[in-house]
From Swiss-Prot:
Its EC number is 6.1.1.23. Residues 207-210 are annotated as: Aspartate. Belongs to the class-II aminoacyl-tRNA synthetase family. Type 1 subfamily. This is Aspartate--tRNA(Asp/Asn) ligase. One of its GO terms (cellular component) is cytoplasm.
C-alpha cells in the first residue's frame, strides 16, 4: 500500500485548468483530486481536478515509483504531480476540455491523502438526490458547476464593492445581536445569560441601524450582511440569507433608482458579460396589478389582463352583471391557440384560479364559426364581438374571465397568466427582463389583526401629495417605495424613509401602537430624529435570490454554500440540535417540548 506523504518541498506552480498548448515543454507541479483514473495498455491516465478545471496526467511504467503510486489511487484521492507538459498525440485531442490539447507526463507522484468511495460521483452530469447532496455538501461543492456558482457569488460581491467604493459608499457592520421589534416575520431569539428572562434578536435587516447611520452623518452606507427570519420556507427563501443593504442621505427617489440601475448594469456586465439597456422600465403598483395581476410582474411576455366591466355591466349573464353592480370587476385574458382545451384542462385552470380566491372561471373559445362557450347564450352578438375585440382574440384563442373583487380578479388572473406563459412557452428563459414597481400603497388593512399594517415597513415615507389622506383615508396613501423585479421575482425593495418625528409618530399611531408602545420599541429612533435627521432613503437586495436568477437556477439553495433544507435543518451538521440541561440552566431556561428526532 502506498504511504500517504507530505509536500516535502513541492510547490504548486499552476492550476490544473490553467495549462494550454503554450505551456508545452514546461515542467509543472500540480495538486488536486483524482477525478477519474483509467488504465490503458500499460499507461495510466488520471484526470486531475482542482477548482480551475481538469487536466490529463499520464503515468508511464518507465517513471518507476510515480507509476506504482498511480496504480493505487482511486477517485477523490488527493495527489501532487510534478511533470512535463506535452501536446497530446494526434487523434487524442479532446475539444470538449479547455486543456484538451495537452497532457502532463508524470515524473514525480505523491499521495497526499486517501478518500473513501464517495456516495455519488463528483460530476455535473449525475442526477443526485438533493438531500444526499446537502448531507455531503463538502463533496457536492467540489462539482464544477457548484464551483462556478461559488465563484459567481464572489465575483458579484466584489463587483458590488468596487462599484459602491468608487461612488463614496462606506461599508459598515451593524450589530448581529439587537432587540426584537414587531411588524416583521418571527425573530430568532438569543437568550441573555447575564440578564435572565431577556432576549436578543438576530436582525431581520439592518433597517434601523442604517437609518441611525444617516443621522450620524455617514451619508452613504452599504453592507453585505447576514439577515435572519423565522418563517415558513419556500424554494427562494432561507432562515438565514445574505442581503446587499444600502442607504443614502440627501437623496430623492430618482437618485436611488438611477444609482441602482447603474449598479445592476455594472454587476451584470462584470460577472455575466451582459449589457443592460438603461433606464429600466417602470410600472406603478396600480399598473402592475391591473395589467399583470402581480406586484412582481414578469414582463418577458404579453398576455396582459384586460378590464371588461363596462362591456358586461348590462349583459344577460348574471354572474358578470351582478359582480359589477356590487362594485366588483370582470377581467379577462387571451390565451393564444388554446381554443381546443379539453374539459379536463379547463377544470384544472378553474381549480388554479380558485386557489387565489376566485369563485369561478368563465371561458370562451374563439373559433372561425364564432364563440363556443356554455355562457355565450347570455350575450348578444354585439357584446361577444366587443369582448373578443377588447381582448384581441383571434380564431383558435381561448378567453378566460374572472368576476370578483378587484384584488381577487387581479391575483387569480395573474396566476393563470404565469401558468399559461409557462405552458405555452411564451418567453425566452434566457431573457433578463427588469422592471421597477413604484407607488405602492403605504398601508393595507388586516382583517385578522383588525388594524392597518405597513405594506413595506413602518419607516416608509408617504408621498408628499398624499399626506393629507393620512387623517382622512389612509388606505389611499401611496408610499415613496419601490421594488426592482427581474423575470417576475422581487430582487429588492426600498423606499425614501421618514425622517421627521411627527410623521413617524403618526405612522406608529396608524399602525395601532400606543405612544408608550412606540416609545418602548422605537424610542432610540424617535430620539435620534430630534437631532437633525437628513432626508434619506435606500434599498436592500436579496443576494442569494439575485444569484439564483443570474445563474438560472430553480432554488437559492444551489447559490448558498451551506443552505438549510425547506424544513429549516442543516443535513450536514444536523442543526438545530438539543443542548445539555447545564446549558439551559445557565440561561435560566427550561425545555417544555417533547423530545423529537431531528429529520436531519
Amino acid at each position: 500500500m502506498v504511504v500517504v506523504e507530505g509536500l516535502a518541498g513541492l510547490h504548486r506552480s499552476h492550476g490544473c485548468g490553467e495549462l494550454t498548448a503554450a505551456d508545452a515543454g514546461k515542467e509543472v507541479t500540480l495538486m488536486g483530486w483524482v477525478h477519474r483514473r483509467r488504465d490503458h495498455g500499460g499507461l495510466i491516465f488520471i484526470d486531475l481536478r482542482d477548482r480551475s478545471g481538469l487536466v490529463q496526467v499520464v503515468c508511464d511504467p518507465k517513471s518507476g515509483p510515480a507509476f506504482q503510486k498511480a496504480e493505487e489511487v482511486r477517485n477523490e484521492y488527493v495527489v501532487a504531480v510534478r511533470g512535463l507538459v506535452r501536446r497530446r498525440p494526434e487523434g487524442t485531442v479532446n475539444p470538449k476540455l479547455p486543456t484538451g490539447e495537452i497532457e502532463v507526463v508524470a515524473e514525480e507522484f505523491r499521495l497526499l491523502n486517501r478518500a473513501k468511495t464517495p456516495p455519488f460521483y463528483i460530476d455535473d452530469g449525475i442526477d443526485v438526490d438533493e438531500a444526499l447532496r446537502l448531507r455531503y455538501r463538502y463533496l457536492d461543492l467540489r462539482r464544477p458547476e457548484m464551483q462556478r456558482l461559488l465563484y459567481l457569488r464572489y465575483r458579484t460581491t466584489r463587483a458590488i464593492r468596487d462599484f459602491l467604493d468608487a461612488r463614496g459608499f462606506w461599508e459598515i457592520e451593524t450589530p448581529m445581536l439587537t432587540r426584537s421589534t414587531p411588524e416583521g416575520a418571527r425573530d430568532f431569539l438569543v437568550p441573555s445569560r447575564l440578564r435572565p428572562g431577556e432576549f436578543f434578536a438576530l436582525p431581520q435587516s439592518p433597517q434601523l441601524f442604517k437609518q441611525i447611520l444617516m443621522v450620524a452623518g455617514v451619508e452613504r452606507y452599504f453592507q453585505i450582511v447576514r439577515c435572519f427570519r423565522d418563517e415558513d420556507l419556500r424554494a427562494d427563501r432561507q432562515p438565514e440569507f445574505t442581503q446587499l443593504d444600502m442607504e443614502m442621505s440627501f437623496v430623492q427617489r430618482e437618485d436611488i433608482l438611477k444609482l441602482v440601475e447603474e449598479l445592476m448594469a455594472y454587476v451584470f456586465r462584470e460577472t455575466l458579460g451582459v449589457e443592460l439597456a438603461l433606464p429600466l422600465p417602470r410600472l406603478t403598483y396600480r399598473e402592475a396589478m391591473d395589467r399583470y395581476g402581480s406586484d412582481k410582474p414578469d414582463i418577458r411576455f404579453g398576455m396582459e389582463i384586460v378590464d371588461v366591466s363596462d362591456l358586461v355591466a348590462g349583459c344577460g349573464f348574471k354572474v358578470f352583471a351582478e359582480a359589477v353592480a356590487r362594485g366588483g370587476v370582470v377581467r379577462g385574458l387571451c390565451a393564444p391557440g388554446c381554443a381546443g382545451y379539453s374539459r379536463r384542462e379547463l377544470d384544472e385552470l378553474t381549480r388554479q384560479a380558485a386557489v387565489f380566491g376566485a369563485k369561478g372561471l368563465a371561458w370562451m373559445a374563439v373559433t372561425p364559426e364564432g364563440i363556443r362557450s356554455p355562457i355565450a347564450k347570455f350575450f348578444t352578438s354585439g357584446e361577444l364581438e366587443g369582448l373578443v375585440a377588447r381582448l384581441a382574440g383571434k380564431p383558435g384563442d381561448l378567453l378566460l374571465f374572472v368576476a370578483d373583487t378587484e384584488t381577487t380578479a387581479a391575483t387569480a388572473l395573474g396566476a393563470l397568466r404565469l401558468e399559461m406563459g409557462r405552458r405555452l412557452h411564451l418567453y425566452d428563459p434566457e431573457q433578463l427582463a427588469f422592471t421597477w414597481v413604484t407607488e405602492f400603497p403605504l398601508l393595507e388593512y388586516s382583517a385578522e389583526e383588525k388594524r392597518y399594517v405597513a405594506v413595506h415597513h413602518p419607516f416608509t415615507m408617504p408621498m408628499e401629495e398624499d399626506w393629507p389622506l393620512l387623517d382622512s383615508d389612509p388606505l389611499r396613501v401611496r408610499a415613496l417605495a419601490y421594488d426592482l423585479v427581474l423575470n417576475g421575482v422581487e430582487l429588492g425593495g426600498g423606499s425614501i424613509r421618514i425622517h421627521r418625528r411627527d410623521i413617524q409618530e403618526k405612522m406608529f399611531n396608524l399602525l395601532g401602537f400606543t405612544p408608550e408602545a412606540a416609545r418602548d420599541k422605537f424610542g432610540f429612533l424617535l430620539d435620534a430624529f430630534e437631532y437633525g435627521t437628513p432626508p434619506h432613503g435606500g434599498i436592500a437586495f436579496g443576494l442569494d435570490r439575485m444569484l439564483m436568477l443570474m445563474a438560472r437556477r430553480d432554488t437559492i439553495r444551489d447559490c448558498i454554500p451551506f443552505p438549510k433544507t425547506q424544513s429549516g435543518t442543516c443535513l450536514m451538521t444536523a442543526a438545530p440540535s438539543g443542548v445539555s440541561p447545564e446549558q439551559l440552566q445557565e440561561l435560566h431556561l427550561r425545555s417544555t417540548a417533547r423530545k423529537s428526532t431531528n429529520p436531519a
